[in-house]
């Protein structure tokens, strides 16, 4: 006799990974519940991560654009805005996103349960509701999509009113004139751009020898130069010895002997999976030191009926990839296997000011692999559209095979880079000889557009061949 479960599947977390899994499951006829500990759906992506930080970035970049526009060069009309004002714009976007995502669940008859869940046994969850009651829920299968949170070292006092992480920085209500950002990864670099754009002094502490080392070196160097040119002070190969919170700010002691003082500190060095509250020990599931779970190609954990997607499984830790992972896991969960899979070359978008985006191999990787590649470049300052809108800072670089003309990598630095990259990505994904740099020479682009950079870069690269 078949077992009677409350649900076919329970999804823990309503971020991009959880949403992708839940929507994929209900579309296949499964009875699904989604558990969310926060009072709104959307997860960290919507409330503390991607959406608010990008909304902040957009507001700041528009202020910079206004102040640098020669039409408004009368200094009596310089535009200024407080961090609190800009946060209001982010709140508006968050509310729109939340309402939209809540609608997805309601239209698809997917039940949302609020509270903190933990495993009792392999098929049972205890749900601690916000009113203090505890419910017991059973399901045949589970998807863990509980996301991640900023890493908190034990010797840093995050309760201090001037010490923030990348979540709590969104509740910053004073106006700092000087900020220390510890950690020069994607989050640290994005917030360095935002604060510097608001005319705040920034000390960016990098524990490594260059910024964003996973990027093509030219892109990394471009960002370093742009930061230097805008007044961001970058300190490479540094680690903190001690962090002191004061009444009027923060003092950071570095292991190199240096001391820095600023109005506040943003600690942005690493993230950890939100698995510690799930009581995974009750079901024999183990996480690594960062609270992350190991999964196979179908996103199954060591227990085949429990799947995991999103930040909780580590790389690539992107909202876009998490949604796809959830969708693939849903297919595997219902059908026993997944025909869909993540694409090999996942695009990266970094929302600094200006943006950076890339897909495929870097020059350093191709050189190490001894692939005979050539480079085609287009400078934004030579494009009519860039000149019209004043977006002269930036470049598009296409790496392609000298003999087959196959596109191997695309790297873009400049405004709208994260949008521009997808034109090249679409051609890179073509099979049967469709992936060729000659496509950009043989097609007709609207004029004037930023997309035209592909034609300029393709001609530049092909002209290097002999």
From Swiss-Prot:
The keyword Oxidoreductase applies. Transmembrane segments: none annotated. InterPro entries: Class-I_Pyr_Nuc-Dis_Oxidored, FAD/NAD-bd_sf, FAD/NAD-binding_dom, FAD/NAD-linked_Rdtase_dimer_sf, Pyr_nuc-diS_OxRdtase, Pyr_nucl-diS_OxRdtase_dimer, STH_gammaproteobact. Pfam families: Pyr_redox_2, Pyr_redox_dim. Its EC number is 1.6.1.1. It is found in: Cytoplasm. Its main location: cytoplasm. GO terms for biological process: 2-oxoglutarate metabolic process; NADP metabolic process. This is Soluble pyridine nucleotide transhydrogenase.
